[in-house]
């Protein structure tokens, strides 16, 4: 997924240019936004990979809306309890824990992106931006360990907003 890697590289480049004194707030803001978009596209492109018509996958990925991903992420803990019941296997519980962390990180990243894009009163520090990028990378790594599981695929379906 070259696009996701490009977003991560762009975020890092914006946050830490060759000359740190050249870093401006706009660079920090765009770095936060790029980190968020890396994970947004990671999730939507993963869902689109399952679409049978290969040449239409880009259109399928565009069906996802930011607000629906946030809603699905906020609702995920309850959905996981419902789907797993009381007798979850250790492997399913580990997957659920990873997905729970992914959902929390996604919501936090979306809030950070909104702040970076719309809250002009906030000044970002390098450390804050670095933490956003690290959170996005942590989500990326976690997602790659669980993305092919039934629980993850259900989460992706929830992101479309259907019942």
What positions do the PLM features span?
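Terminal alpha-helical segments
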Residues: 1-163
């Amino acid at each position: 997924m070259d696009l996701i890697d490009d977003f991560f590289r762009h975020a890092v480049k914006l946050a830490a240019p060759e000359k740190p004194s050249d870093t401006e707030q706009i660079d920090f803001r765009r770095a936060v936004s790029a980190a968020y978009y890396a994970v947004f596209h990671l999730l939507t492109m993963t869902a689109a990979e399952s679409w049978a018509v290969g040449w239409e996958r880009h259109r399928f990925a565009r069906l996802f809306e930011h607000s629906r991903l946030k809603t699905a992420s906020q609702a995920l803990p309850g959905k996981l309890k419902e789907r797993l019941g009381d007798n979850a296997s250790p492997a399913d519980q580990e997957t659920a824990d990873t997905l729970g962390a992914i959902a929390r990180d996604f919501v936090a990243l979306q809030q950070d992106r909104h702040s970076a894009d719309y809250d002009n009163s906030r000044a970002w520090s390098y450390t804050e931006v670095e933490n956003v990028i690290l959170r996005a990378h942590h989500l990326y790594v976690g997602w790659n360990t669980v993305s092919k599981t039934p629980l993850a695929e259900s989460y992706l379906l929830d992101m479309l907003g259907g019942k």
